[in-house]
A protein has these predicted regions:
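Catalytic beta-strand-to-alpha-helix segment of the class III nucleotidyl cyclase homology domain
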Residues: 41-147
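Catalytic NTP-binding/metal-coordinating core of nucleotidyl cyclase/transferase enzymes
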Residues: 1-50
Length: 148
């Protein structure tokens, strides 16, 4: 059981090492980590989207050399709106909750999903963003998925 835990922790560490350069390259701030979740802030939805695409690309490339049982994937949710940022150590707010819901419960492997609020912030929305709607806990949730 210990070897399984250590293996999982090593995969999380490797994922962090692969993602952090993409976050920094696009001007993002890594605020906190929880297990395999990274909570980041960006100046714009466009830069968050660019970082997300870069992360998926980097993970896809590294998977070519990793054994299949060690492949790394990302499920990314991007939100936009008022948040409470506690000294770059923690984040709270509706859009934080929605983007977490998208990434943890709805997104498939290597999917990038945007909340509706994030989507409307894009000055040049891509035709590659497909509108989706899902019912979660009795609530209707509209989001946009970046087509691969």
């Amino acid at each position: 059981a210990i070897s399984v835990i250590v293996s999982f922790l090593l995969m999380i560490h490797q994922m962090h090492r692969m993602c952090c350069p993409s976050i920094a390259a696009h001007g993002g701030t890594l605020v906190k980590t929880e297990a395999d979740n990274l909570f980041c802030l960006f100046d714009s939805v466009a830069t968050a989207l660019a970082a997300a695409q870069d992360i998926v690309h980097r993970l896809t490339m590294v998977n070519f050399v990793l054994p299949e049982d060690r492949h790394l994937y990302a499920s990314i949710g991007i939100g936009y709106g008022r948040i409470l940022n506690i000294e770059d150590h923690d984040l709270f707010g509706d859009e934080v909750n929605l983007s977490c819901k998208l990434s943890e419960d709805i997104a498939s492997r290597n999917a990038i999903l945007l909340t509706e609020q994030a989507y409307v912030q894009l000055t040049e929305p891509s035709g590659c963003l497909i509108r989706q709607e899902v019912s979660v806990s009795g609530l209707s949730l509209v989001y946009y998925e970046l087509a691969n």
